[in-house]
Amino acid sequence: MRKKSHVSLSRYLLDHIDSELLENHRKAFIVGSVLPDCKPSFVTTKHNMEETFDMVCEFIRKLTVNSDDYKKISTAYCRKLGEVTHYLADYFTFPHNCVFTGSIREHCIYEKKLKFALRSYIRSGEINVNSTVVRRFTTPQQLCDYVIQIHQQYLKCNKTVESDCRYIVALCHVAVAGILNLLEHYRNSNPVAAAAAA
């Protein structure tokens, strides 16, 4: 996805996920959502499931279970959460998948169309997110398994910018809400850490 698409997505997530943490660190979350495209590794590491999913699952673990120092849950935390959305969104962008056989030029043309389609989809108010699944995650691994399951579903569907929009928005919404829910769960199960964060 293009940087502007990642910004549009991050703004949607900020506006539709009820989180004081995100609200207090909006800019960090938005910056995080474009950061992977600004790193030198962008040239050598493809943003696809095969090359980066293990890293993303590790990020998810650190954003939930391994967040021992709750005083640091702030700007850096939200920036890293934004990075997670970047990779997840790219996994559901057709040219970032092994089923795409087009050229770099076709990749760029597709992402340009996706930029406009995503903006239009977000503004349409026709977004359908299964928020009930968020509460089912009791471990970071369950969330990662869910991403794999939805990605397998995605690979079987017709690849259009419209289907990409639906998958990207719904999956990223569930993932961010799921990460924040897991964080809250682990904070509540560790009263000492929760008191330190207050």
Protein language model features and the residues they cover:
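N-terminal leader/auxiliary helical segments
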Residues: 1-83, 88-198
